[in-house]
Amino acid sequence: MAIERTLSILKPDAVKNNITGSINSYIEKSGLKIIAQRKMLLTKKQAELFYEIHKDRPFFGELVEFMTSGSVIVQVLIGENAVSKYRQIMGATDPKQADKGTIRGDFANDISENRVHGSDSLENAHREIAFFFAECELV
């Protein structure tokens, strides 16, 4: 079993609807630990760079607009198989397909405002964590 780090973003809809504490409970109950956390307002440039992988997709502009529409909470999670474990507790990207008992299944209604982001691979987790945090902040 590998101890991994992964990035979590509690999106503007989660912050606005004051469900960040509930989401953190799901994270902690899964056995993952939050080792770094920061509340911030992403600039358009930051959102474009972070989601650059989606720049040619039709939803890119809407995604950037949404992610800059309010505060987000970026977190680094650590634990056994953190990337896959967090993806499991997030639930399917489309909340309509997400199981009950997952973050999206319990708290989200719309695919474009689905409450959370999580790294989709260990490689992307390293890149995404470095985007927001210096190594010395991860304690």
Swiss-Prot record:
Domain of life: Bacteria
Name of the featured protein: Nucleoside diphosphate kinase
Reaction(s) this enzyme catalyzes, per UniProt: a 2'-deoxyribonucleoside 5'-diphosphate + ATP = a 2'-deoxyribonucleoside 5'-triphosphate + ADP; a ribonucleoside 5'-diphosphate + ATP = a ribonucleoside 5'-triphosphate + ADP
GO cellular component, one term: cytoplasm
Enzyme class label: transferase
Known role: Major role in the synthesis of nucleoside triphosphates other than ATP. The ATP gamma phosphate is transferred to the NDP beta phosphate via a ping-pong mechanism, using a phosphorylated active-site intermediate.
Annotated SMART domains: NDK
UniProt source species: Wolbachia pipientis subsp. Culex pipiens (strain wPip)
